[in-house]
């Protein structure tokens, strides 16, 4: 208990943030020095690593994100197995930063989402909202001998929120500008957009998931080209989008739903990819044309969401992009064309590595959980109140 009190009272902490997203490509780990809280928080990133999932682990996770193929036994074992992977990632990023793991004060571990059900639904006579992220925080804390904050989404769901997106707290702290409105777009498996008016207060922030980013593109790359992703967007660049199919796709139920909203594999997973492929084949599209259409779907759905749900209230002066999608040159070109004349820039222009942003976010959320600082934003998630996010797991003596 004395150690926990000392951790709470300490303003400056060495924190590792861990993020494994819906793209299922592996775990990102960022080691960062954090000091202060809220708008006074200062951040000094020291190292970042990406640890790819072994093929067998990735395939097992993917199998267990599908209700038709998941099993309780597999999910239970994955909860422990992923904690071991996360422990290795902490060791790797500490080595990359050339620091002893014993100097790490805290770990923030998002976990691997296998199911996210933010809309209330009946469960044995009671409506509930629910989410499940694997990578047991107590197992991780025990392996590392370091306190771990995990289970970040449950408190917001308990307050009637979507439990997502959570990155907007980080966006506000790191990117709010006094004299311009900014859009922060993260292109992971899912695309999420944060809108920061000039000098944004917490209640001014708006954010939501716009739809798929890399999730559909990567699935099509696997199906059409036997590749984990479309490198640099080269297959999409070699094709021509089918605008009639694109128009049909943009009429999908999720795109028509008003914020606050969040999404994942339930909406844009294997079943969605099957339907898209079927529609492409009925139009006799080539693999390259199919990839071009799916890539444009990401860019067009982001812009459509901005035009419908953001611009009428708050136009942005620039769009700042992060996540794995920044490496897809075709996707970035399509975004630039859609948002012209608004400039599209990577977060690296502002001192935050695009691949590291989400891992840094969960380091910050863990740091603020120990501070007792509320980090959900009801204007974003729809929750009824603000609350600290995350549960603290502590190692044994």
UniProtKB/Swiss-Prot annotation:
Belongs to the anhydro-N-acetylmuramic acid kinase family. It holds the Pfam family AnmK. Catalyzes the specific phosphorylation of 1,6-anhydro-N-acetylmuramic acid (anhMurNAc) with the simultaneous cleavage of the 1,6-anhydro ring, generating MurNAc-6-P. Is required for the utilization of anhMurNAc either imported from the medium or derived from its own cell wall murein, and thus plays a role in cell wall recycling. Its EC number is 2.7.1.170. The keyword rRNA-binding does not apply. Gene3D superfamilies: 3.30.420.40. Keywords: ATP-binding, Carbohydrate metabolism, Kinase, Nucleotide-binding, Transferase. InterPro entries: Anhydro_N_Ac-Mur_kinase, ATPase_NBD. This is Anhydro-N-acetylmuramic acid kinase. It comes from the Bacteria. The gene is anmK. The keyword Nucleotide-binding applies. Pathway: Amino-sugar metabolism; 1,6-anhydro-N-acetylmuramate degradation; Cell wall biogenesis; peptidoglycan recycling. CDD domains: ASKHA_NBD_ANMK. ATP binds at residues 21-28.
